[in-house]
């Protein structure tokens, strides 16, 4: 991977760990949100000297630390019931934190403030630690947590740092070596949604000003990963599930995760933390009585330090049992590759011009506001530019668009060649339907809420006859809107045979 500085790193490669920011000796790097709401490094070229330190420290560019066990020991853990009640899973994080506090140490974890911003901070006692409990399904803003960790270590303090595997890798790269007083715990990670998506969800669903608390997970209605809870200032509660809550649905279906999450080298073995922690999903498949419905933590001891810490807290838990690693892997993500949702790009595009709720619904259902018919696929610049303008105008009106591909034709066709300029442009800037035969066009009624026929000679009989009567929208249901925009016959008269002209006139009445 060859980059001049960290600002040249592709978005598919950057984890957003911020190690580069605090490693730069000239303060030339800041983390800024992009259009999707994820944070990426931005380099001030006037301050940058090209020293290359940001490249050397980057967990994406550098090799993965392979020193931990490729097949770590796996454990199922229950904290005491009162701890599990207030935890997302088995309460092991609280057990660890109490151990560190008892040694005069500090805990670094993620909290959500009263503005529902999610970020890393430091807790020096159990009261400050309480907000760190519970899952937060948003990529946390690391702020200045790495320098703070370094500062506490410099004072001889024990530090417990929890974060996603890539964040742990970033911290270790920033520190530059093994720290005896540092205990790192990487979390089992499905992937990270953006701050922007969560903010839009909160504002649209509840109104931030009305909300008192939000919990990404709750056990009030059973132990699962798909139930969230919002508590309003007036005392009312909202419970959301995968069936109807847009954030839960989009997160579990990987609709709005960071691009790097799709191929994360830190999700696989060996892990980056001294310990790995998360829910032991699928534990019932191994041993049913290890799931009592109150939460079970999966803990991996990735090295000798992690194993020693786990041994030291055994007397502080209600139950701990060694399990086969295969049981841990079966229902959890322990691999680099993950299939992100095919509509991810479209979701973030829609987020710019419509509600988060609608963007999730239409992307999950494969629906569009408008299906655009016409000759956009023609091999000329004017045609593709005109249809691009039409689609952008509709998007500014808050409408999602689907370009309906060339109907009916089967066989060799240069307009279908992926190497021609119109196809290259379309693949980059449009969402294009699959090819439909003429007798299949009616299926588009299940996908598009309305239809538009675009400009150019779409009603020129010499052109349109190649597509049956599809450019007259013969396949569109009566109740759906049918609109023509700058459609043309190309001549001052129609060249259809009389019988076809009469039939066409009936179709025109439906517009």
Predicted region positions:
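Local cysteine-cluster metal-coordination motifs and their immediate loop/turn environment
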Residues: 12-26, 49-61, 164-170, 257-269
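Aromatic- and Gly/Pro-rich donor/ligand-binding loops
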Residues: 368-504, 508
């Amino acid at each position: 991977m060859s980059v001049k500085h960290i600002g040249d790193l592709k978005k598919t490669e950057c984890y957003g760990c911020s190690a580069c920011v605090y490693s730069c000796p000239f303060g030339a790097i800041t983390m800024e949100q992009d259009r999707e709401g994820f944070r990426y490094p931005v380099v001030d070229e006037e301050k940058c000297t090209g020293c290359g330190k940001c490249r050397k420290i980057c967990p994406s560019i550098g090799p993965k630390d392979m020193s931990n066990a490729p097949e770590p020991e796996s454990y199922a853990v229950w904290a005491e019931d009162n701890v599990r009640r207030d935890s997302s899973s088995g309460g092991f994080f609280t057990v660890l934190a109490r151990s560190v506090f008892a040694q005069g140490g500090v805990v670094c974890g993620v909290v959500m403030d009263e503005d529902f911003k999610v970020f890393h901070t430091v807790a020096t006692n159990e009261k400050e630690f309480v907000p760190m409990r519970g899952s937060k399904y948003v990529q946390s803003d690391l702020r200045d947590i790495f320098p703070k960790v370094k500062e506490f270590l410099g004072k001889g303090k024990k530090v417990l740092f929890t974060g996603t595997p890539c964040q742990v890798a970033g911290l270790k790269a920033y520190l530059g070596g093994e720290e005896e007083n540092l205990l790192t715990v990487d979390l089992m990670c499905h992937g990270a949604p953006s701050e922007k998506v969560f903010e839009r969800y909160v504002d649209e669903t509840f109104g931030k000003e009305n909300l008192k608390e939000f919990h990404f997970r709750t056990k009030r209605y059973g132990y699962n990963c798909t139930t969230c809870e919002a508590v309003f200032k007036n005392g009312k509660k909202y419970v959301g599930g995968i069936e109807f809550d847009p954030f839960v649905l989009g997160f579990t279906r990987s609709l709005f995760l960071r691009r790097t999450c799709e191929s994360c080298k830190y999700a696989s073995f060996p892990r980056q933390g001294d310990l790995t922690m998360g829910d032991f999903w699928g534990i019932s498949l191994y041993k049913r009585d290890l799931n009592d419905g109150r939460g079970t933590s999966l803990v991996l001891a990735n090295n000798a330090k992690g194993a020693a810490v786990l041994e030291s807290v055994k007397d502080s838990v209600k139950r701990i049992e060694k399990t086969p690693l295969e049981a841990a892997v079966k229902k959890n993500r322990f691999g680099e590759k993950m299939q992100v949702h095919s509509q991810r790009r479209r979701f973030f595009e829609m987020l710019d011009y419509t509600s988060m709720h609608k963007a999730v619904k239409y992307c999950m259902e494969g629906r569009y506001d408008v299906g655009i018919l016409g000759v956009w696929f023609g091999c000329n610049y004017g045609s593709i530019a005109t249809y691009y303008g039409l689609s952008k105008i509709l998007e500014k009106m808050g409408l999602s668009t689907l370009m309906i591909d060339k109907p009916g034709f089967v066989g060799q066709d240069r307009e279908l060649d992926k190497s021609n300029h119109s196809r290259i442009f379309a693949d980059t800037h449009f969402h294009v339907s699959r090819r439909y035969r003429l007798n299949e066009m009616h299926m588009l009624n299940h996908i598009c809420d309305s239809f538009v026929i675009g400009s150019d000679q779409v009603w020129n009989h010499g052109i349109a006859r190649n597509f049956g009567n599809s450019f007259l929208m013969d396949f569109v249901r009566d109740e759906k809107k049918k609109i023509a925009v700058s459609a043309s016959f190309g001549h001052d008269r129609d060249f259809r045979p009389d019988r076809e002209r009469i039939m066409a006139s009936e179709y025109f009445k439906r517009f």
